[in-house]
């Protein structure tokens, strides 16, 4: 996988972004057009997420969301040797990114690594902590902190919708 994965504006979604969209900010029953835009973006490879996001959302046991995820399985990218290596390197560079006691996994490094490999913007529900990253083990850093340190673009759901509407 490389930057050629994303031919247009590409967005890599974190678990918190999709969960917040579904349960509060952009509920499908209230804003079905948002989900139509997301579905269309998935079809052309402009909306992606790592498999680990799927696995985290699967634990939510939200049956309607699980049904949607299964219908849009193409969004969730399989692990590749390159992605695994990128995640290992990221966790080495940012040991305070992952909750060490989180079971069974933490999707955060996978989201960042996939976005970096694909040249995608990250959409997350997390807020920047302002913590300086690199070498520190405490306090825990969040996705926006690491993205800032690595020069990976951050975007909001509104940014995504606007970009996808402009791409039509």
Walk through the language-model features, giving the residues of each.
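Metal-dependent nucleic-acid phosphoesterase active-site entry motif
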Residues: 1-33, 49-52
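Acidic, PIN/NYN-like endoribonuclease modules and their adjacent C-terminal/linker elements
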Residues: 1-7, 31, 128-168
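Residue-level detector of structured alpha->beta connecting loops
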Residues: 46, 73, 116-119, 151
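A short acidic, often aromatic-flanked loop/helix-cap motif at beta-alpha or helix-coil junctions
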Residues: 55-56, 82-87, 151, 160-165
């Amino acid at each position: 996988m490389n930057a050629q994965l994303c031919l247009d504006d590409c967005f890599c979604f974190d678990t918190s972004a999709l969960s917040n969209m579904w349960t509060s900010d952009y509920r499908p029953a209230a804003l079905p057009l948002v989900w139509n835009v997301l579905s269309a973006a998935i079809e052309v490879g402009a909306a992606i997420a790592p498999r680990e996001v799927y696995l985290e959302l699967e634990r939510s046991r939200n049956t309607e969301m699980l049904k949607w995820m299964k219908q849009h399985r193409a969004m969730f990218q399989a692990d590749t040797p390159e992605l695994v290596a990128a995640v290992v390197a990221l966790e080495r560079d940012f040991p305070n990114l992952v909750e060490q006691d989180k079971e069974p996994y933490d999707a955060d490094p996978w989201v960042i690594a996939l976005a970096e490999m694909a040249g995608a913007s990250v959409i997350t529900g997390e807020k920047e902590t302002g913590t300086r990253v690199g070498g520190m083990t405490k306090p825990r850093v969040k996705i926006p902190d690491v993205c800032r340190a690595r020069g990976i673009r951050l975007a909001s759901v509104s940014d995504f919708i606007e970009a996808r509407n402009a791409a039509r």
